[in-house]
From Swiss-Prot:
Disordered, as annotated region: 216-239, 372-404
Encoding gene per record: RUNDC3A
Family (UniProt): Belongs to the RUNDC3 family.
Organism: Homo sapiens
Coiled coil: 267-322
Protein name, as recorded: RUN domain-containing protein 3A
InterPro entries on file: Run_dom, Run_dom_sf, RUN_RUNDC3A, RUNDC3A_B
One GO biological process term: small GTPase-mediated signal transduction
UniProt keyword Phosphoprotein present: yes
Residue span of region Interaction with RAP2A: 1-298
Organism lineage string: Eukaryota, Metazoa, Chordata, Craniata, Vertebrata
Residue span, RUN domain: 52-189
Record's function text: May act as an effector of RAP2A in neuronal cells.
GO molecular function list: GTPase regulator activity
Subunit annotation: Interacts with the GTP-bound form of RAP2A.
One Pfam family this sequence matches: RUN
Amino acid sequence: MEASFVQTTMALGLSSKKASSRNVAVERKNLITVCRFSVKTLLEKYTAEPIDDSSEEFVNFAAILEQILSHRFKACAPAGPVSWFSSDGQRGFWDYIRLACSKVPNNCVSSIENMENISTARAKGRAWIRVALMEKRMSEYITTALRDTRTTRRFYDSGAIMLRDEATILTGMLIGLSAIDFSFCLKGEVLDGKTPVVIDYTPYLKFTQSYDYLTDEEERHSAESSTSEDNSPEHPYLPLVTDEDSWYSKWHKMEQKFRIVYAQKGYLEELVRLRESQLKDLEAENRRLQLQLEEAAAQNQREKRELEGVILELQEQLTGLIPSDHAPLAQGSKELTTPLVNQWPSLGTLNGAEGASNSKLYRRHSFMSTEPLSAEASLSSDSQRLGEGTRDEEPWGPIGKDPTPSMLGLCGSLASIPSCKSLASFKSNECLVSDSPEGSPALSPS
């Protein structure tokens, strides 16, 4: 028995949930439909003249739009649940608009926040509706707000118009209002936030439907039977005007529709031109940035090649400056980048017998400047010690050390050169040494 009671309760809860969702769907559909009728009425009557607060059609449209923005809004009440049409909530749709529309360029949110005569959230929301219509940017505001899905879900319950596909339909309808000039005064009792909004459905319940739009045969037969029984000229399906008035009214309606479509066409063409100009500017900026990128890449490659060449040149110079450890002295002297010229000690002073035979060791060398010569002037004393070490036919050079190229600086002296400064007066970069048996000048202590 308890199980059956639980099942019954669950079935009732499920049915009530379905009924609630069905009611919400009906509310959504009704609000979108009446909003479409209201926008159509505004476009038909006020395309050629501005609209202000005295227009009943606008007052009704503002009430409908406020109801749509407040549909399933999470309003916080002091106690008890708040319905979607209640005016007892602590906050209104303005709190959502203030956050979701803050990213719109040149928006009116800050100006409405700074209004002194408007304090409540409802009054600010109504002021925003009027300012957005005067700016002809209502559709842009709503579209930007819908893109912020996180904020929208935070302010609206499931089933709200702002969370459904009907919101896209709403933005499409609001585009047509850009063809109307609105003029409002943001002062008065309509913006105090205390007066609840009421939608007047009576203008949209009066309609005339012709037989051409009837699709159900039974409905057509019932209409014919009711016409024959009542035989009353006030039947809604019978024409109440003459043919001339009918044609004139049709022509007037067609003219109004043409003006509306023409105004919307001009607005859309202007919008397309604006977007095309923006697209051209962006394409030009893109090309400019591409050229800058290509130039930067080419310059980078050139600098890279130059640096690689410098690295290779420095490696070659470093390889030439660092000889092998056990190479002969002559081979090491050949590897010098700046050879020593006329800096060898006199062979006669070292060994008289070997001086004449080895005097041909002098070669012709070239030097670039006098700096390498002057840099080794301080090594003359070491050269004298080398000369003393070669007496009695002993090999010249320090005993116990290898004659490696690192000791080349100890093999010569600048004492035989009259002056290092006189080298700058040489007309040629090459020095020719004769093969005469005369030895070099004796070493002079430094």
